[in-house]
Amino acid sequence: MITNKIKIFLISLIFISGVYALQVDAPQYQPNVIHPGDDVDLWIKITNDNYDNEVKNIVVEVSPHYPFELRQVNPIKGKATISHLNPGESDTVYFKLHVDENAPSRDYEIDVKVSYDEINKEDGKETIHHYEITKIYYLHVYGIASFEINGNFSLIPSKTQTVPIEIINTGTGTAKEVNLYIGYSLNSVNAGSESVEVSAYGTTKTQEKTIYYPTAVPISNLPISPVGETKFYLGALKPDNSRVINLKLYTASNLVEGCYQIPAVITWIDEDGTKRAEQITIGAYVKGDILLGISNVVTDPKEIKPGTTYVRIDVTITNNGHAEAKDVKLKLITNKPFKDSWSNCNIKDVGNLLPGVSKTVSFYVDVDKYASAKHYKLPIEISYLDTANNKYKTEKFIDIYVKPKPLFEIITKEVNVTAGKENTVYITIKNVGSEKAERVKISAIRNSGQPFDYPIKSDTIGTLYPNQTGTGVIVIDVDKNAESKPYIITIEIRCAGDSDEGDNNVYVYQEPLKVVVNNSNSKSYWILGIIVVIAIVLVVGYVFKRKNSKDKE
């Protein structure tokens, strides 16, 4: 394609003579470089080349093709007239055109038709000859590049991600030497201005042109910033062509969910050689993540031991993410040796948690008295909805330490005592707990409703290690009228914790002991004696009767 020149094709329609009296010059126009959307001033010079004859009734018609449109309407749209031209005389006609804004780069046709009458005077006689000339001219329109950036991606705070973006030339001209700067601003340095006088067929225009040098300047501390490469060379981009590049971006940790703009600068050279630059932005959607964490686990009492009931466990749930968590629910799942202190006491409805917000909830558990001393991982089930009402469920664990303590079991299942006397009773106990017991002491607790007194009701056993047994002695004085039957008395076991482990607590337990009373004077013994006598009489009578029967035979 030939640029900056006009290609002229002459198509002539000769009606009367093959010799033209008029010369039609190539059109002159402003601006010299035509772009889509421009208004173009067009001048056409007509000269009477016949130095013998006058020409009259000159009509110049312009018929533009796409993308040109006539704007000149006086006196008739697209038509200009010259009344006459003497031999050698010339005149200029003026037209105004508009270029369609979406015209791509190429040469476009303009048809110029000139009709006139030539006056031929010979031998005093005037003869009129009519002529029509059609010429085709091509004006070049330089398209202008324009850019659009597409990137369908989302980012997550505190993360570095590689995302693709597409750069599209949506303009009408080819862009050369295209460069893309990510995380830059456009700083145009004004270098002054210049005045340019443009003349065409005696018409002079003065144009003021500002001179500036576009410069891409990097921006620091961006909420979304490029990592590594920030400048990308794309080469030439024709209209409707595109390039895809991969950006590595870091998203700041303090960003909340929403839309953000990444500044960028794109530079290129248009088809007419003009250097251009544009400040653009890349739209990015930061999708906040939801990170629910459990912290600040506090128990009451602070020291949890086997057999403790109504232990309160306070936990703090925090949304460490960047998006709101909705309808948050917590459920403490208890397994042996733990159980809920009451129904539904360990299901908590927290509600909504905004980013960075915390809430504290309380759970209540009972600890089995035979629980082993160790660390336990109690699961907490967390359910919630995200901003799009999608359901999620996760599980966190809290650490609960059950400390050791002594625990006792009476090995002696029952003792036999005699009514009306003092009975020395040996009671064996075992430390079935997980901690050494110091200063172990047993005591019988007197019950006024029972026929017992305790001349010696207590005895010190000493120290018992876990799984070790010890025996203590008490004396039970049984009332002489006590009935012969089993009784259940209460034995109190008192001890101190393991001082070597810093446990100075005093532990008190009460365990039952079966005491069987034997009383020969009691009504039960009389009844038993009568039954025995009757049984003996019956047996003797039966034997005697059989013996007499045999003697008679």
From Swiss-Prot:
InterPro entries for the chain: Ig-like_fold
Residues spanning the membrane: 6-26, 524-544
Record's subcellular location: Cell membrane
Sorted UniProt keywords: Cell membrane, Membrane, Transmembrane, Transmembrane helix
Keyword presence, Glycoprotein: no
The UniProt record lists the keyword Transmembrane: yes
Family to which the UniProt record says this protein belongs: To M.jannaschii MJ0795 and MJ1506.
Protein name: Uncharacterized protein MJ1561
Originating species: Methanocaldococcus jannaschii (strain ATCC 43067 / DSM 2661 / JAL-1 / JCM 10045 / NBRC 100440) (Methanococcus jannaschii)
